[in-house]
A protein has these predicted regions:
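Conserved catalytic scaffold of divalent metal-dependent phosphoesterases
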Residues: 1-56, 60-75
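Acidic, His/Gly-rich catalytic cores of divalent-metal-dependent hydrolytic chemistry
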Residues: 70-150
Length: 150
């Protein structure tokens, strides 16, 4: 557990690869900012300033997608399954979460980005929440965090 905290504490605030940016909160490098807290104007400014065409974020525990192009800003929810991206638009994609669901569905949610096909495949997977809660409590983590997994 302390080794994990040290590892996480030494990570960079963002990472770029394959024409894509990865950041926990909001681009360019915030780990604390929530996507849903920001105005459309702020989202547009961020997308315009990004050198990458795709940006994956976390922090919200939701499957959100925001894109910007000639037709303006579009916002919505990613659905389970294959989602095709428009090569002419820039995107901020919230990748869901394993734990602490915000949508009433406590399955782990993750996605696979295919940079060649420019698709995002959203997947939901059941997992043993009770076992995870038990391990969290045994590790001395706060009970409120363990209970949020349900």
């Amino acid at each position: 557990y302390p080794q994990s905290i040290n590892f996480i504490g030494n990570l960079k605030t963002h990472w770029s690869a394959h024409g894509c940016r990865f950041v926990h909160g909001f681009p360019p490098d915030s780990v604390l900012t929530y996507l849903f807290q920001l105005s459309d104007e702020t989202k547009i400014q961020s997308l315009e300033q990004l050198s990458e065409k795709r940006c994956f974020i976390g922090h919200t525990h939701t499957l959100d997608i925001v894109s910007f192009g000639r037709q303006g800003l579009k916002s919505g929810k990613l659905k389970e399954g294959l989602n095709k991206l428009d090569s002419r638009r820039k995107y901020i994609i919230s990748a869901g979460s394993v734990g602490q669901p915000r949508d009433g569905n406590n399955k782990a949610k993750y996605l696979i980005w295919d940079s060649t096909e420019d698709t995002v495949d959203v997947r939901f997977v059941a997992y043993d929440i009770a076992a995870v809660v038990e391990k969290m409590m045994a590790a001395g983590l706060p009970q409120k965090h363990a209970q949020r997994l349900w």
